[in-house]
Curated annotation (Swiss-Prot):
Belongs to the bacterial ribosomal protein bS6 family. The gene is rpsF. Binds together with bS18 to 16S ribosomal RNA. SUPFAM superfamilies: Ribosomal protein S6 (SSF54995). CDD domains: bS6 (cd00473). One of its GO terms (biological process) is translation. It comes from Chlorobium phaeobacteroides (strain BS1). Keywords: Ribonucleoprotein, Ribosomal protein, RNA-binding, rRNA-binding. It holds the Pfam family Ribosomal_S6. This is Small ribosomal subunit protein bS6. Gene3D superfamilies: 3.30.70.60. InterPro entries: Ribosomal_bS6, Ribosomal_bS6_sf, Ribosomal_S6_plastid/chlpt, Transl_elong_EF1B/ribsomal_bS6. One of its GO terms (molecular function) is structural constituent of ribosome.
Length: 134
């Protein structure tokens, strides 16, 4: 038995599909990962986005990021299943090594959420406080 490693998979599903079909495709993605020895830790469904360039005449894709632990020997079967799924336009599986995880922690530590008080300039904050007083 191999040691399970941490992976991140980004999937772009055809955005022209109905919401039910996108949800069904996401269920298939989860099932393929689980069937091939993967333990899903985190799923972030970003939703529909306009792509930078068309893929297979599609300009809108539904994006999802999945973090899972799996054996390296199971990746080939996962990739093959994704390639044969017509609803998946693109996918990328990346091994999250220790340096990558450390870099991610540093970025999260210093990142600012858009719309948070840290994101606003002093002028915006002053305008909001003046508006609140009125």
């Amino acid at each position: 038995m191999e040691i399970k490693k941490l992976y991140e998979c980004t999937v772009i599903i055809n955005g022209g599909l109905e919401d039910d079909a996108i949800a069904a495709t996401m269920d298939e993605v989860r099932n393929v990962i689980a069937k091939n020895g993967g333990d899903i830790e985190n799923v972030l469904e970003v939703g529909r986005r306009t792509m930078a360039y068309p893929i297979g005449k599609q300009t809108i894709g539904s994006y999802a990021h999945i973090e899972f632990r799996g054996e390296p020997s199971g990746l080939a079967a996962i990739e093959t299943a994704f390639r044969y799924n017509e609803n998946i336009l693109r996918f990328l599986i990346v091994h999250l090594s220790t340096p990558l995880l450390e870099m991610r922690k540093r970025v999260e530590k210093y990142s600012v959420v858009i719309g948070s008080p840290e994101d606003q300039s002093e002028e915006d904050q002053q305008e909001e406080s003046v508006a609140a007083k009125k």
